[in-house]
C-alpha cells in the first residue's frame, strides 16, 4: 500500500488502540482471547489498531510471534480498520529486514518504528535510522517518539526533517503539548500528528492534531469518540467536561508500569488477557484494587 493510500485511510482513524497481547498461564499467546476483545474495541469506536507495540509487550515477543499476531488480527478485522505493525527495534539492520518481511504480507497499512533505545544515538543517527527503515520497502512508517521509555528523544526539528521523506507519514508523539503544537503547526499538510499520551488526547485534537494512539481506548473508546465529536463541533467546554471526567481513569491506567493496569482491568471485565511476560509483572492485589475502584468510580 502506498503512502498516499495509507494517509487517506488514517485520516479516518482518530482513535487507534495499541492492542494488548493476551497470554495463557504458561506464557504462550492466547489467540482465543482476541476475537471478543477486537470486536468489542471496534464496536466502541476503535478506528485503527497497533499490533506488537509497547502495550503488546513487544520487547518480549519474537518476530515469529508478531507475525502470528498480525495474521490473526488481520483475519478478524478483515479490512474494517487500518492495521499498524510494530516493526522497530534499536538495531537498524533488524528493523529494515523485519519491515521488508511485514511489507510482503500485503495487509499491513503502516509500520510503527520506535526511537532506538539504549544505544543513545545522535539526532543524525536517529535520522539515518528512520530513513533506512522508510526506504527499505513500500510500507509507510509512523515515527514513535517516547523518550520516557527509551531515553533518547526525536527532537521536533528532526521529526520535521524526517517528515520530508515520502514514506514517513505520521508521528506518535509522547512528549509535551508544546511539541505537539509546534509539530502540528509546521509539518507538511498530509503528515499526521497523533499523541501517544492518553491524557493529552483532548489537547492534541484541539490543537489540530489527528487524534490519539491509545491504551485507555481499550475501555474508554466511547468517551474519546464523544470528546472528539464535541471538539469537531466546536463545543470545547463540553469536550473539556469529558476530559476532566476520564482523566482520573487514565491516570489510574498508568499508575503502575503499562500494560499491567489495563490488563488488570480487562481481566476484571472478563477478557482473558492473562498476565505479563517478565521482566514485567502483574499489579499487586492492592494496586489492582485501587485501579479497579478508580475505573469503576
UniProtKB/Swiss-Prot annotation:
Please name the pathway. Amino-acid biosynthesis; L-lysine biosynthesis via DAP pathway; (S)-tetrahydrodipicolinate from L-aspartate: step 3/4
This chain's source organism reads Lactococcus lactis subsp. cremoris (strain MG1363)
Which controlled-vocabulary keywords does the entry list?
Amino-acid biosynthesis, Cytoplasm, Diaminopimelate biosynthesis, Lyase, Lysine biosynthesis, Schiff base
* Catalytic activity of the protein: L-aspartate 4-semialdehyde + pyruvate = (2S,4S)-4-hydroxy-2,3,4,5-tetrahydrodipicolinate + H2O + H(+)
**Which residues hold pyruvate?**
55, 213
The subunit structure is:
Homotetramer; dimer of dimers.
Function, as annotated: Catalyzes the condensation of (S)-aspartate-beta-semialdehyde [(S)-ASA] and pyruvate to 4-hydroxy-tetrahydrodipicolinate (HTPA).
Name the NCBIfam families on file. dapA
Spell out the Gene3D superfamilies in the cross-references: Aldolase class I (3.20.20.70)
Supply the name of the protein: 4-hydroxy-tetrahydrodipicolinate synthase
SMART domains for this protein? DHDPS (SM01130)
Alphabetical list of Pfam families matching this protein: DHDPS
Q: Which domain of life is it from?
A: Bacteria
GO cellular component annotations, sorted alphabetically? cytosol
The primary location reported for this protein is cytoplasm
**GO process annotations (BP):** diaminopimelate biosynthetic process; lysine biosynthetic process via diaminopimelate
Q: Which GO terms describe its molecular function?
A: 4-hydroxy-tetrahydrodipicolinate synthase activity
List the residues marked with site Part of a proton relay during catalysis: 54, 118
The EC designation for this entry is 4.3.3.7
